[in-house]
């Protein structure tokens, strides 16, 4: 009986403590947990390599190159073919040989949404006001049986991210994504773990993602190496010459 009372009091105290916290305080604690703003801002480029394991047991090699302020290029290599998706700061483009498309092509508004999130170099919580994002603290939740602090992040384009923070480390352990596309909602879940410091900044080395409520469709990316301030060239992200004329007639992707 006494043990149960102690546990109950502890839970109540924890609940009262976290209720007093604000979204701003949790964002600040998350940034500090990652290494602090100074160390985060000292990184200007990233080169990540890893392996992606999907349903059916297939394994692909993946890379992600990114540069400030909003350039990203991602590759997916399997069975001698390499797919590419990139954002040059204005337009998203891709090469998808797996579907028989060996030539570069522009990405549509719906397809480019995830790439735009990846292009946000520091993520949506850093300088969120300047980016036009809003953050709300929604209180406690449970992730795989463990307590978590839930933040709602509404992006400038209207999409919503729910971040679940570990109450001890304040690092993200889960992210739920809601994309609003032509009157419908597309939902995905991303689980983050195996954090390691690189140049003083914490990065997740295990990333499992897939459609919400479909765990069997999840894919797991295991990061093998992260190089910070890698010598990347802007030309790696630029729209191929064959697409530039068509892109000039399209609205800037950031405006969607």
Language model features with spans:
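Alpha-helix boundary/capping detector
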Residues: 52-57, 118, 177, 218, ...
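N-terminal mature ectodomain segment of secretory-pathway/periplasmic proteins
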Residues: 24-100, 132-139
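Bacterial N-terminal signal peptides
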Residues: 7-16
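Flexible, processing/modification-adjacent segments and terminal tails
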Residues: 20-27, 31-32, 39, 91-159, ...
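Bacterial N-terminal signal peptides that target proteins for export
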Residues: 1-7
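Gly/Pro-enriched, hydrophobic low-complexity segments
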Residues: 81, 144-239
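Short amphipathic beta-strand/extended segments with alternating polar/hydrophobic composition
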Residues: 61-65, 85-89, 103-111, 165, ...
